[in-house]
């Protein structure tokens, strides 16, 4: 009887372990660094030391936070499509004046995560997990890589 109870408990534990491992993780963690040098975007000097959402570096590429104001300043828009659960990022929008968003001083290495939702850039769906320079999230904000392919092409 005791052996049967132990076998049943082990079987239940195995089933729970398998079931929990099948649940996809929402986001994968990575590390990025806060940009420490002088930052100029579109001719505007950015005070990254006190920025609420600082520019970050990942794999030697600078990433900018897609806040409402900074995105418009860069001529980029990000729209959430609730039907398809996709973040649509589009370049070429009207640019606005720079509006600083200040916060606490940040420096060093920070934890960033890959989003679990789908992403399209200029109408093309991307496989963000396979990107050399993926789009990621930090402090609830989407960060976009300033690569040649995205910034110029």
Feature names for model-found ranges:
Residues 2-11, 20-153:
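Primary recognition of N-terminal secretory signal peptides and signal-anchoring hydrophobic helices
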Residues 13-15:
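Hydrophobic membrane-insertion alpha-helices, especially the h-region
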């Amino acid at each position: 009887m005791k052996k049967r109870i132990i076998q049943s408990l082990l079987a239940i534990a195995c089933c729970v372990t398998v079931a929990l491992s099948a649940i996809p993780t929402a986001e994968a963690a990575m590390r990025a660094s806060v940009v420490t040098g002088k930052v100029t975007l579109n001719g505007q000097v950015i005070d990254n030391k006190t920025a609420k959402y600082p520019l970050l570096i990942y794999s030697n590429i600078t990433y900018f936070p897609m806040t409402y104001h900074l995105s418009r300043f860069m001529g980029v828009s990000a729209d959430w499509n609730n039907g398809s659960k996709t973040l649509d990022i589009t370049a070429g929008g009207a640019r606005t004046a720079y509006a600083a968003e200040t916060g606490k001083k940040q420096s060093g290495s920070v934890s960033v995560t890959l989003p679990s939702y789908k992403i399209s850039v200029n109408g093309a769906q991307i496989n963000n997990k396979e990107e050399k320079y993926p789009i990621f999230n930090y402090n609830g904000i989407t960060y976009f890589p300033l690569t040649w392919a995205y910034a110029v092409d």
